[in-house]
Amino acid sequence: MKLSIAKDQLIAGLQAVQNVVSTRTTLPILSNVHARTEDGRLYLTATDLDVTVTCGVEAQVTAAGATTIPVKRLFSIVRELPVGEVELETDDKNLTKLSASASYYKMNGLSAEEFPPLPKFKETGSVTLPQDKLRAMLKKTSIAISTDESRYVLNGVFMKFTPEKLVMVATDGRRLALTEEELPAGSTASGDIIVPTKAVNELNRLLQIGRAHV
């Protein structure tokens, strides 16, 4: 894999995914970010096996490929680089070479094949909402999420979808927070799910106010 990418693009991608990486993992591969190229973009993925986040950023790809790189080390290096283009190159032994201006680094990674595969879901419906509305709903309900790990079913936000509206509920057994939002015409989602606390926190962090729909 060989590519050139703007520092701010690489930083944005790493910031989007690195928070899900646990500092106490016993599996070395989970300390790494999965990096792969496709259609002129660099896709970064991190997981703790409960929550997985993927972010795609623009890059000038010279040679396609995939590898995994220690995410905390990569972020700390890129953050200190001067503004401009960053060159990334990975060989068949998963040694990644990074250069920018007069700076040059080498990082040993692990094979992309060792990285846990993304779960596959069968799409049964869809709904579109402005990011700020979804973020507001999560903010209103997440305050009541239970922190009692013995009551796992309460460790998240319950979402109920109908073609007409989305209802979110959270409770810790003492407090209950509920909010609902009418859905636009054409929504096809139906059913209910529980979104775990860590996923809710990541959504609250990643969703933007006044930005595009999700």
Positions of the model-derived regions?
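Structural preference for solvent-exposed beta-strand-turn elements
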Residues: 1-211
